[in-house]
Amino acid sequence: MKHLSISAKNPLRVALAGALAFALPATALVAPAVPAAAQSGELDRVVAALRGITTMKANFTQTDRAGRTVRGELTLKQPGKIRFEYEKGTDMLVVSDGKAVSFVDYEVNQVQRWPISNSPLGALLDPKRDVKRYGKLVPTGNPNVLSIEVKDPKKPEYGAITLVMVKNAGAPGGLELASWVALDSQNQRTTVRLSNHRYGVSVADSAFRFRDPRRSSRRPG
């Protein structure tokens, strides 16, 4: 497994990078199996909901295992593009241009990149990632909430992501992505919660570019 070289002096930075790179399933999410027929039908709904998103903006709150929290705005454009714009004072950026996910640290002038397919975010961004094939419905006890753990058993090094979908008639496919959870190889659990979803908004491709801090120390405006 490739280890990220993000500065270890800031545990939050390590957690943010790890959660978006390689992750392992959380044992706390293990639950009794859902009947196959129910699995298939609900997973079809999840796939339709995720694929129904063309563009989306939402506010996010990202919390690591120690309870450290950062906030910002997420911008998504299918296929494959996403941007996590962190709040002022957090000199980091996570962006995918449709091919690779980049973790940009403006504090230490570093950029880490890895293919979308090697990231748990591939469940959201990679059209080749078959959520129905690799997803497993995890019981929640709430008929309005679906929890789906997505991982490729043949490639455990690619990690896993657990998506939490909430029934919402106003969302594509009637399901809204409320949050996701990742647990990295260093046992650092990260939770991302979304709010204030806006669908079908105009998003330029330029939103998924960034100024490389290795060439310039200035953060993009």
Describe every region a protein language model picked out.
Residues 3-26:
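Bacterial N-terminal signal peptides that target proteins for export
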Residues 61-63, 85-87, 104-106, 151-153, ...:
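A generic structural motif
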Residues 71-125, 190:
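An acidic-aromatic
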Residues 133-134, 139-220:
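Gly/Pro-enriched, hydrophobic low-complexity segments
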